Structure formats: structure tokens, C-alpha cells
Amino acid sequence: MLAKMSFMQNVKNIQEVEVSHKRVLIRVDFNVPLDENLNITDDTRIRESLPTIQYCIDNKAKDIILVSHLGRPKGVEEKLSLKPFLKRLERLLNHEVVFSQNIVQLKQALNENAPTRIFLLENIRFLRGEEENDENLAKDLASLCDVFVNDAFGTSHRKHASTYGTAKFAPIKVSGFLLKKEIDSFYQAFNHPLRPLLLIVGGAKVSSKLTLLKNILDLIDKLIIAGAMSNTFLKALGYDVQDSSVEDALINDALELLQSAKEKKVKVYLPIDAVTTDDILNPKHIKISPVQDIEPKHKIADIGPASLKLFSEVIESAPTILWNGPLGVHEKQEFARGTTFLAHKIADTYAFSLIGGGDTIDAINRAGEKDNMSFISTGGGASLELLEGKILPCFEVLDKRH
């Protein structure tokens, strides 16, 4: 894993190439959450892209073209347009931003002579061929720029036209500040970390994190497994989790993982009690029970107070902490205590804390602890693939130092 991260660290950064009087296309990640009125509820990803954009402004780039996706549109969907982002961008950058409906319109605007201009292209996923990595679309985007900058870590594990494809055909292709910060932070967490190194994994499914868990056992010292995925491990150990969500097909995998952890001397911690309910969506009866005594027909929705105490003690002894995935159904206030408590606990330590996953970041924001974590990754799937020991495809096509 470290060798692959080192390979990705060898990618050239925007500071290593000339951007003055150049046309720069930056693949940013503005895939931010919106409320029902299409207002941005968390602009973290937009703010994280600002240093790269500002660097181009300060170094007098001729034109700056911002390309991003938003959501998963099926064709053109007005509710997923990037046009409403203009005012937020202009306020954050203190600079005019021109919206381009499509590439043809953008090309026409680029032919006009003017001082540094910033263009925001409409949601790239409105264009057919983006997610299929269409070569013609990639060449079209590459033709717009002298320098291509990938600053969208969250999509770097996907071979899409605006990330992987454009980089293949652009004359110069480098990473932005955010991409560099992401890789450097992950490398810091694993390259001679202060030990014990603790990994906390939560979320709904074992299947989504099984590869990660198998690959990371050689690098960690302690492992907390919580969230709905812990139900499968509890059942594998013989506990009756009643109506809780379980991936029965992965029972043997769970047992093999626990055995492997034991052989590698990785201490594994599972919940010892739980907050349960008869109905997670409309809870009428909520109970706290030891995991060996779950109420019939109840579902586990959060970790209980005894688990909180146990996990707190583990966290207090760990100078390096990685966390990916909530500990319960944190979207509902009744079952958010475990995840919120964990966020506060990690924030109160002196540990180097690296946080990944959209649900985890959302929980940390709700807890008001965003500024008290060492590093919060903007990538969900990309973070997982990195931890699984994979080289993210978009790094392969960027220019290397040697």
C-alpha cells in the first residue's frame, strides 16, 4: 500500500509547471449536498478547491475553466445544474465567474481577449459520454486547455472523460493542491505512524469494506467494527441479533477476517451493547440491551453506553486514528448518540485523525467538530480504494516527476 501511495505522491503538482498566460482546466469536485430548495448545505468541497483556483488567479493564468459533476443525472436535470453555484463561487473567490451552458458556448467565449477569466462549465454529467470515458468528449475537453489540473480526489477512482480521459490528451496534466493534500495525509497516516494505529469502520455493509479490512490488517494495531456491518460479525460469533440487518452470505468471511486479525495480533473490538428498536423509520419502542440479549423482533440502530465507554478507552490510547463510517442510523436523532459521541471523543484527543466517507463527514459536521479533526478526506469511494491498496486510475495518467 505504501509503495502505491508513494507512486501517487510522485505526480507533478501545479506548482511545478508554468500557468502564467496559460489556459488552465481544473477538474474540481463540487458534488456537494443540497436541500429541497437546491441550496448548498455544506460547501466544504468547494472551499477545498479554492487554493488551486486562487493560485491560478495569482499567477495570472489566461483563462481558468472549472469542470465538475453534481449528483447522478439521467441526462439534463435542471435541479442538478451548476448555475446556482455562481454566486457562491464569486463570493468565495472575490472574482467574476462566467457560466457556460456547454462546450461550444465555452469555446466561443475563450476566443475573446480579456484578463484572467474564470469559467464554470455546466454539470459535466449532463453530457453523454462522461461516465463512459468517451474519447471524443475527452479530446474536446483537453483541447480547451494548455494545462489540465485534477483536483477532484472524490472522482479519482473513476475512469471518466473529464478526469482520466482529459488527462490522457492534455499536453500538461498535474495535480492540484487538494489532490496532493489527500495523498500526503493518507501517506502520513501509514508511513511510520505513532502507534497503536486504530481503524474505526462503520456503515451499513460488510461487503463494501471487506477488501479494505483484509488489506489493512498488516498496517493497523486495533480495529473497531460498528454500525450495521457489525451485526454480521456478531451473528458470526453466535449472537442472536434478531431482526437486525445481516449479510448472511458473508458470515464465513467475517469469521475468517477475525481469525486473520488474531493471527496478525490486531485487537478487534465489537459493540457489547446496543440501542434497539422495533422500527427504525418510526421507532415506537427503543431499548438498550447487551448484544447477547437483544429484544425479539428488534433491530440494532446504534451502539449502547457500555460500547461507548469501551470504544472511548480504545480511542484514548491511540495516537493515530482512521475513521470511516457511522456507528448507527445517525440521520435519526434517536440513534445518533454513538456517532456524535465518537466525533466529540476523537476531537478531544491529541491524535492524528484522518476521516473519510460522506456519512462520517456529515456526522462530524452535525457534531460541530469539522475543524477539530486533523484531516477530513473529500473522497468517499476514492478513500476506500486507496485504503484497499489500489492505485487510483486518474493518478496513472498525470505527469510524473521521474
Swiss-Prot record:
Binding locations of substrate: D29, F30, N31, R45, H69, L70, G71, R72, R125, R158
Catalytic reaction annotation: (2R)-3-phosphoglycerate + ATP = (2R)-3-phospho-glyceroyl phosphate + ADP
GO cellular component: cytosol
Subcellular location(s) per record: Cytoplasm
GO molecular-function term, one example from the UniProt record: ADP binding
Alphabetical UniProt keywords: ATP-binding, Cytoplasm, Glycolysis, Kinase, Nucleotide-binding, Transferase
Domain of life: Bacteria
Annotated residues for binding of ATP: K209, E331, G357, G358, D359, T360
Descriptive protein name: Phosphoglycerate kinase
Protein encoded by which gene: pgk
